[in-house]
């Protein structure tokens, strides 16, 4: 509690200084300096009592204890009255013992003279009035205990503990509860981190156990079947290579005088005709029939007459229990075929790179395997470069995905507020929904605008307020808790489209982008733009407005000519503003000087979305040309990286239906968002959000996670990291909003 009081005092000082209340600040400092409660510091209160005893100031000691009784002890229940009385008695005895030990009998006599009226009727003091007159009170059995060092230390510790418990149990004002909240938050974060590590450890253990279960089965299959090299590598051998392997094996067989039973049974369909020697001649019908009955069931389309063994070798092999061996062999070959097909369907590279543990006699070639690629559920890239099906560690775990379905038309904007607790969504019909998702998904406010709405932004300081930009030249301030419009201001009648709104992080102002009617929709502002290059090349203005007075402060200069600004974004402290325009130019404004610091042509066509990077040394932009580009803001026009994105990530977005129905929507909301550390980016796609890894050296963005869940193209995204778990929002053209909760893996 003492630490919380001290920090609160500092915050109050800072606030008074910020507001210019210097007289109040001086008065506060004076009262804090004379504070008898010492900021609820127990050690300072005990030190104050000891200092008063050391200077023999009995009156001040009595007054200070009376103040503590009146200010602190009076709040306790009656059952603690005996404890307080015992502490007071021990304090006065401690004072008397100190006067005797320092040979100040006059102070001891003064104590009894001033306290006699109060103490003479108390039984515990009747023996103490003779204390000043005893020659050696420390040897007296009645007082010897109080002169020991142990008793003095015990009293100080008891007083300290009593005050500590008292301060912990005291009701505190709301402003001091933040310390306990911080401690609880830190504790929850630590518990979350422990659970996170346990979760990833369990995942790794499950993966290891699965791998251990698969490995013995694969090894057993290889040991049992003893496949020769040309069978295990059949999937990557051509005809010429296969003929060479067969010829090599023919040479090895001619050198070996011993022929096994299994080799005599295996069909010879893959042998070259050159293997038949003139002395062998054609096979006997009986041997052909035997080969059909025992070996022909495993593989279809075999030629029983090609390359058969002589009758003597075959009959010597069939002499031992041919029926039992044939069934056992057929069962093993079928199991082997199933296992190879399963391995090939799981990962082709794993089976292709395996080497057989032993090369046995000739075996029946497996039938041709048709492998189907495993559709990735979350990862876009599956097996690693070495094969083996071992996936790289996923950066996120999807804890859950929920759907908000109260919109019935295409979403334009979907934004989480600063606290990460509420979401504001806007569709093309002018329906605004404010809803929460923690602990349950619930609509808090709903409103329908008579005029078309084009832009939406949360206020930063009062996060209950929404800024709504319309298509008729007005900006509305909407209170989400009172569920009403606080005010509506007219921006410009000649430039009715409010394309973008951005509120400064300090909450004092916001910027507003107003533009003339688009060339494709001069009358109906709700009609979607077709996204052709040059269709939005209309005049525009960028204005700065005061949030409190709702009055225009200034108009920014847009060089070389006024143009429609599509997107705006502030940096963390509001000193910089970046904008993307319909002419493909990115402009960086200094908000302290209120002027354009630099500008450069970034895209062919319009700039759809622009954001600052995590370290704010660069900005990212997505344009009509389908490029995702990173720019250095310290050098105008310096390109750090450039990537090409799919058309369903950049727009215009197209939703097709039956009978030639086709809906086209140009990007309005945010097209990409970053995680808390700026290492990953969430973008739109035709079936859901896609998360890419940033900062790599590759020329192509690495797709890490596909969120999915949508049946219509996703048109805007947002990523909130205010909570411990990240929350990804993806909104689509069918009015559905998916809320995906992610747990980030921390190394």
Swiss-Prot record:
Phosphoserine modification, residue list: 256, 288, 293
Pfam families: CTLH_Armc9 (PF23138), WD40 (PF00400)
Keyword Coiled coil: yes
Membrane topology of this protein: Peripheral membrane protein
GO CC, alphabetical: cytosol; early endosome membrane; endosome membrane; late endosome membrane
Biased composition (Low complexity): 265-279
Coiled coil: 183-215
Assembly with partners or alone: Interacts with WDR81; involved in early to late endosome cargo transport. Interacts with BECN1; negatively regulates the PI3 kinase/PI3K activity associated with endosomal membranes.
Function noted in UniProt: Functions as a negative regulator of the PI3 kinase/PI3K activity associated with endosomal membranes via BECN1, a core subunit of the PI3K complex. By modifying the phosphatidylinositol 3-phosphate/PtdInsP3 content of endosomal membranes may regulate endosome fusion, recycling, sorting and early to late endosome transport. It is for instance, required for the delivery of cargos like BST2/tetherin from early to late endosome and thereby participates indirectly to their degradation by the lysosome. May play a role in meiosis.
Protein name: WD repeat-containing protein 91
Organism in which the protein naturally occurs: Homo sapiens (Human)
């Amino acid at each position: 509690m003492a630490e919380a009081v001290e920090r609160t005092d500092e915050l109050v000082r800072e606030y008074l200084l910020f507001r210019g209340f210097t007289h109040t600040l001086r008065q506060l400092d004076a009262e804090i300096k004379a504070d008898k409660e010492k900021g609820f510091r127990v050690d300072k209160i005990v030190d104050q009592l000891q200092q008063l005893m050391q200077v023999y100031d009995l009156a001040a000691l009595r007054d200070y204890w009376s103040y503590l009784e009146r200010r602190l002890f009076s709040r306790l229940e009656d059952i603690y009255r005996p404890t307080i009385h015992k502490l007071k008695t021990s304090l006065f005895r401690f004072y008397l013992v100190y006067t005797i030990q320092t040979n100040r009998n006059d102070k001891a006599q003064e104590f009894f003279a001033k306290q006699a009226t109060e103490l003479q009727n108390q039984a515990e003091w009747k023996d103490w009035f003779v204390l000043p007159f005893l020659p050696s009170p420390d040897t007296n059995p009645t007082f010897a205990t109080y002169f020991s060092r142990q008793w003095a230390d015990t009293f100080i510790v008891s007083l300290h503990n009593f005050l500590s418990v008292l301060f912990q149990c005291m009701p505190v004002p709301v402003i001091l509860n933040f310390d306990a909240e911080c401690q609880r938050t830190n504790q929850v974060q630590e518990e979350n981190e422990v659970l996170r590590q346990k979760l990833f450890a369990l995942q790794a253990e499950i993966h290891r156990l699965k791998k251990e279960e698969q490995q013995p089965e694969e090894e057993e299959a290889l040991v049992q079947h003893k496949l020769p090299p040309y069978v295990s590598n059949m999937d990557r051998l051509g005809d010429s290579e296969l003929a060479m392997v067969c010829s090599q094996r023919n040479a090895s067989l001619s050198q070996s005088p011993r022929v096994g039973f299994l080799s005599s049974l295996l069909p010879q369909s893959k042998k070259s005709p050159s293997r038949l020697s003139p002395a062998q001649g054609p096979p006997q019908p009986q041997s052909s029939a035997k080969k059909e009955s025992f070996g022909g069931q495993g593989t279809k389309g075999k030629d029983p007459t090609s390359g058969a063994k002589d009758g003597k070798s075959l009959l010597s092999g069939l002499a031992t229990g041919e029926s039992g061996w044939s069934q056992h062999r057929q069962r093993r070959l079928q199991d082997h075929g199933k296992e190879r097909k399963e391995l090939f369907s799981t990962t082709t590279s794993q089976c292709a790179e395996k080497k057989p543990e032993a090369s046995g006699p000739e075996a029946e070639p497996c039938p041709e395997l048709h492998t189907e690629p495993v559709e990735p559920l979350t990862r876009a890239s599956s097996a690693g470069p070495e094969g083996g099906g071992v996936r790289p560690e996923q950066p996120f775990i999807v804890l859950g995905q929920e759907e908000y379905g109260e919109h019935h038309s295409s979403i334009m904007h979907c934004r989480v507020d600063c606290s990460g607790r509420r979401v504001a969504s806007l569709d093309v019909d002018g329906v605004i929904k404010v809803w929460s998702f923690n602990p349950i998904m619930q609509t808090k406010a709903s409103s329908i605008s008579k005029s078309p709405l084009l832009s939406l932004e949360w206020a930063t300081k009062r996060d209950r307020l929404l800024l709504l930009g319309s298509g008729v030249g007005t900006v509305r301030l909407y209170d989400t808790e009172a569920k009403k419009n606080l005010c509506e201001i007219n921006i410009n009648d000649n430039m009715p489209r409010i394309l973008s709104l951005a509120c400064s992080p300090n909450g004092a102002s916001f910027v507003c982008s107003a533009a003339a009617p688009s060339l494709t929709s001069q009358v109906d502002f709700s009609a979607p733009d077709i996204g052709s290059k040059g269709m939005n090349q209309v005049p525009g203005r960028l204005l700065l407005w005061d949030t409190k007075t709702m009055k225009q402060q200034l108009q920014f200069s847009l060089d070389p000519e006024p143009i429609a600004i599509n997107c705006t974004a502030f940096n963390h402290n509001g000193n910089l503003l970046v904008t993307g325009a319909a002419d493909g130019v990115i402009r960086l404004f200094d908000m302290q000087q209120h002027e354009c610091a630099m500008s450069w042509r970034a895209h062919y066509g319009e700039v759809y979305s622009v954001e600052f990077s995590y370290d704010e040394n660069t900005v990212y932009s997505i344009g009509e040309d389908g490029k995702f580009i990173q720019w250095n803001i310290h050098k105008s026009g310096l390109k750090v990286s450039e990537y090409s994105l799919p058309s369903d990530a950049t727009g215009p977005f197209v939703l097709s239906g039956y009978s030639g129905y086709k809906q086209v929507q140009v990007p309005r909301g945010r097209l990409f968002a970053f995680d808390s550390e700026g290492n990953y980016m969430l973008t739109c796609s035709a079936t859901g959000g896609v998360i890419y890894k940033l900062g790599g050296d590759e020329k192509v963005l690495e797709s890490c996670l596909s969120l999915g869940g949508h049946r219509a193209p996703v048109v805007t995204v947002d990523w909130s990291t205010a909570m411990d778990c990240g929350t990804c929002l993806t909104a689509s053209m069918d009015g559905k909003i998916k809320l995906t909760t992610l747990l980030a893996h921390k190394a």
